[in-house]
């Protein structure tokens, strides 16, 4: 075999290898590991509901469903905390009034707030490891939820979280 044939085969092998590399798309990061530390980041509600429902199932409780009204209220709450650069329940003072105004009649509501966690996985782990937050996620009657994270780049914590879980009053 002559040298030019070896060179052609070697070049073909290199090009085939490069083409294979160019065709590979890196796998997308799971939603619970996506950073919320960007202005366009949004919590994936169904992923959060699945994660919380799985945790509840492991503790003998029923699943929760994403509720659009609770998602909107959680977003407003997280946005309010981020705007004030303050982690507090002040935004929830008229919480039941806000729920009723949104057409959501609740028998009971519980909420978790936090700041500084950059991913859903971190926020969930923090809540799971905190007895009062854990109790809220394991509230026996809860059947609906809303969750949000808001990025505030100039703030102390950068990302503010709000989770609202409720028992919808069907009467």
Where are these regions (language model features)?
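Short, surface-exposed glycine/acidic/tryptophan-bearing loops
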Residues: 71-118
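Disulfide-stabilized extracellular recognition modules
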Residues: 119-171
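Conserved beta-strand positions that form and line the central face of beta-propeller blades
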Residues: 63, 112, 164
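Sec-dependent bacterial lipoprotein signal peptides
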Residues: 1-19
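Bacterial Sec signal peptide processing site at the extreme N-terminus
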Residues: 15-39
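Extracytoplasmic
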Residues: 43, 61, 69, 108-110, ...
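Post-signal-peptide N-terminal segment of Sec-exported extracytoplasmic proteins
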Residues: 27, 36-84, 97
């Amino acid at each position: 075999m002559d040298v030019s044939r070896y060179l052609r085969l070697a070049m073909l092998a290199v090009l085939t290898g490069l083409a294979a590399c160019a065709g590979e798309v890196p796998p997308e990061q799971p939603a619970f590991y996506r950073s919320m530390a960007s202005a366009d980041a949004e919590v994936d509600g169904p992923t959060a509901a699945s994660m919380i429902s799985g945790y509840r199932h492991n503790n003998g409780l029923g699943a929760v469903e994403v509720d659009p009204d609770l998602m909107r209220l959680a977003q407003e709450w997280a946005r309010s905390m981020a705007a004030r650069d303050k982690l507090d329940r002040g935004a929830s003072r008229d919480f039941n009034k806000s729920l009723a105004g949104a057409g959501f009649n609740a028998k009971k509501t519980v909420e978790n707030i936090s700041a500084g966690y950059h991913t859903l996985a971190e926020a969930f782990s923090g809540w799971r490891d905190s007895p009062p937050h854990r109790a809220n996620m394991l509230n026996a009657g809860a059947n609906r939820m809303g969750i949000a994270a808001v990025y505030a780049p100039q703030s102390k914590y950068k990302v503010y979280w709000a989770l609202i879980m409720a028992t919808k009053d069907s009467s």
